Amino acid sequence: MTKRISAEEKLNRKPISRACVFCHEKHLQCDVGRPCQNCEKRNIGESCRDNVRKVRKTRGRTPRSGVMNLRRARREHEDELAIATKSRGAGEPGSTGLPQVPSLSTLFDANVDPVIDEELLPATYVDPLGPSDVELPTSGAESFGSVWASSEYTKLNEILGSPGIERPRKHVPSKYEPFAVPATAEHSPSPSTPIELLQDHAGLLFRNTLRRHISLDTAQSSYQASTQDTQASTVASSVSCEGAQFPASEAEYTSPYSFRQLVRSPEDLYRHQNSIFPHNYRQAYLELLNILRARFLSAQDEIAREEGPKQLHSIAQSIKTYYAPIFVTLTSNLIESDLKMHELILQRTLLEYENMSKMVNCIPMCIWRRSGEICYVSNEFISLTGFSRRELLMRRRFIMEFFDNHGIVDYFKLFNEYLAFSSKEGFSSTSDGQAVFSECNLLMANNSFLKCACIWTVKRDSFNIPMLVMGQFLPIFDMDHT
């Protein structure tokens, strides 16, 4: 073992610049003599020599001469600055020699000399325009470098156009705005009826002025037609059912019941994947608009007729404020192949949900698309409501048809604000933001309503776009205590 040394010896020892090979390997305190004392004690003084250090890699490093030149140049520059500061301080009495920091008002004052002389800046850093000449693009002549910049500009214009916020100047509609309105209608009053407001807001989901495939409505005919760009100008007028130009959906629409007869397993799905096209959400929303119009504006009950327009206005406002802006942003870069993949993933997920409901005894369950179209109902749901499977799945049916008026308003509020994109907090929901708990009145086959506690779970795709909503309903039986 190595001999222990006292504290005094440790203090008297002085470090050396380079140890011998033996002391370096054994991590011993070496001395300047050769051979050193450690090697002499071990009778290996013949082999005692200085340890050779490894040469540092100099690749990518500045040569020593270059470093010295840089240091010398920096030192000369500092000396020049010091001389200039002293001369300036000598000419101004009371100056402390410290650099004067300009205020914010000085920085934005065009009449004051710039803080940095433009002659010292490279040509690429000199702004060719003055501070007053720079402004945001407001006309269609300008172009953005990316779709994301265009979408962000659209959202800013949308914020400026919100109620209660006055615009500082007249705004000209741009080709980058997916829901731009004419300039003459900038200060026009709001629609006189809630259905006009709903049609106006529903148009936000159908227009595709940013890109060819930005909207919800990519029907099967979009794969065959080559005149899609020429139809963009007429999409706004097609929101109303009277002037709508769309194919006969009943002839092309494949009901969930018929589709399940053809595709019963994942193998069948991939075998017929070339025959699967993106879902026609545009036609679905138009039919949903007719249902909401009939429910809220054509009610026979006097109280329902009075509250109907207000409730319809609330639904439209919820779609416009919470759902449409985020949806347009997420779908701005989607192409036809993405929409087809979206439909394939939806059908594959639906098969998994169906198998899950058959393997376990679950509470009544119903699955529908983001548009509200029912895709699947469990046996327990059929037993609870009294409707047959063919009644629910043989034609296009919406989950809103089985709620009362207040339930429809609550559903749209929960879906748009909390469930679709998990964009809002503060409601009773799961930690991952994919499910919410609520109550609703569910329609029975005898036209009566049954109060149910429900949980709505959303399934999103890789683009964070909602595909399916799974609703589970647990009946609540009120017991009368007498």
UniProtKB/Swiss-Prot annotation:
Residue span, PAS domain: 350-422
SUPFAM superfamilies xrefs: Zn2/Cys6 DNA-binding domain (SSF57701)
Regions recorded as binding DNA: 20-48
GO terms, molecular function: DNA-binding transcription factor activity; DNA-binding transcription factor activity, RNA polymerase II-specific; RNA polymerase II transcription regulatory region sequence-specific DNA binding; zinc ion binding
SMART domains, sorted: GAL4 (SM00066)
Pfam families reported in the protein's UniProt record: PAS_13 (PF24990), Zn_clus (PF00172)
Entry GO CC: nucleus
Alphabetical keyword list: DNA-binding, Metal-binding, Nucleus, Transcription, Transcription regulation, Zinc
CDD domains in the record: GAL4
Keyword DNA-binding: yes
GO biological process, one term: cellular response to starvation
Localization in the cell: Nucleus
Signal peptide stretch: none
Tree of life domain: Eukaryota
Family to which the UniProt record says this protein belongs: Belongs to the ERT1/acuK family.
Its job: Transcription factor which regulates nonfermentable carbon utilization.
PANTHER family the record matches: GLUCOSE STARVATION MODULATOR PROTEIN 1, ZN(II)2CYS6 TRANSCRIPTION FACTOR (EUROFUNG)-RELATED
Name under which the protein is recorded: Glucose starvation modulator protein 1
Organism encoding this protein: Eremothecium gossypii (strain ATCC 10895 / CBS 109.51 / FGSC 9923 / NRRL Y-1056)
